[in-house]
Amino acid sequence: MKKVVRVAAGQGFWGDDLDAPRRQVEGGPIDYLMLDYLAEVTMSILQKQKERDPSLGYARDFVGAMESVLPAVVERGVKIIANAGGVNPPACAAAVKAVAEKNGAKGALRIGVVSGDDLLGRLDQLIAAGHPLANMETGEPLSLVRDRVLSANAYIGSEPIVEALGKGANVVITGRSTDTALTMAPLRHEFAWGATSWDQLAAGIVAGHIIECGAQCSGGNCLYDWRSIPDLANVGYPLVEAKPDGTFVVTKHPNTGGRVSVQTVSEQLVYEMGDPHSYITPDVIADFTTISVARDGDDRVLVSGIKGKPPTDKLKVSVAYRAGFKAVGTLVYVWPDALEKAQLADRILRERLDRLGLRFERILTEFVGANATHGHLAGDQRNAPEVQLRFGVRGPDRATVERFTREIAPLVLNGPPSVTGFAGGRPKVEEIVAYWPALIDKSVVKTKVDVIQ
């Protein structure tokens, strides 16, 4: 058993810094590279791509990342764990295998492919069997929107990743695993933590929670003393140095920008935390109220004292469904009286839509630069140098939303003076993909692990 296992984060979302994975494997010693690509809306995007082309449906940025880190995997034994499989883990694995062969590393990768989280093809069967997949916020059954569902994926835990590592995989590709499982799984594998080692498992979850968003815990998007954080253009992504007892240090590679401090780690700890006594995952429930966070040197933070308890018998399910259409148009009004001009344009546009008989589920106006973020707390903004009118509509009928998009440009000549920001053309109509969170019994979600070479 290793005394210390180093897990580095290389992606915090699909669209993150493309060069970060390479920097993490080249910047210093690590054992595992964790790449987190998936968010709730990402699954529906990937499902649409797969519908158009059955060979797609995964985070294609991962394939390029694998090409950049391939030497580290082959020569230094760094292992890769990523949820880049999206709704098509086998296709993702095939693409990675092809990259390895193209780069002269045929047979060097043992790719673990985790499937079973995708419930889209089983929805009708599950509903008929008494699993209503009720919305966690409203209590409504999924049957209300079943005909508009785009994707449905259960959040799976660390067990299938641990299984893949146990079968000798040096690259593990999952679909909708929890973000935290990508870090906890290698620790559980290396330290042989048992299924009821609640405190150690909870420590793995907290480690994963801290680094799952990439550089957000190493100086990026940090509110505390943000002006003094150095060299964010070369920000160092985080890594954890974990021990068998569950304690770990959060740090980053030397000669990189950003900062790892008690403040940066603490800000990330409370990100999407929910109940601090019960941070629920498929593997364990972690208690965040017992955590100790202490400085352990420059850019080093020691995390300890973590407690855990048994998980529930449910898994969370992320469902995405079609919910109509939207369009957003913008115009910029400048001083003097910028806000007053934008407000007049808003009234003109609303009256114009009413006269045309256009009806929408919602019309939303924001005055960016005046009160879009702080609302009535913004204070007197009558002397703002410029204000952007941001006018959006949503509704079930695409044609009605499309008609709205033709009403923004006429305001340039027919509305208040001192207007700019209209050179981008008419607003685009976009389909709305809504989120439906639900729970399902763990017993009905069966994961499968295949290892290909």
Spans of features found by a protein language model:
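A conserved active-site cap/scaffold subdomain adjacent to cofactor or substrate pockets
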Residues: L201-K307
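Gly/Ser/Thr-rich loops at beta-strand to alpha-helix junctions
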Residues: F13-W14, A39-V41, A84-A93, R176-L182, ...
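Catalytic or ion-translocation cores adjacent to nucleophile or general acid/base/metal-coordination motifs
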Residues: K102-L119, M184-D225
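C-terminal non-catalytic interaction/assembly regions of soluble proteins
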Residues: S304-Q453
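Gly-rich Lys/Arg/Thr-decorated short loops/hinges at beta-loop-alpha junctions or inter-strand turns
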Residues: M1-K3, E40-S55, V74, L119-D147
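Flexible, glycine/charged-enriched surface loops at secondary-structure junctions
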Residues: K106-R110, C217-L232, P276-R295, R352-V368, ...
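N-terminal amphipathic/basic leader segments beginning at the initiator methionine
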Residues: M1-V25
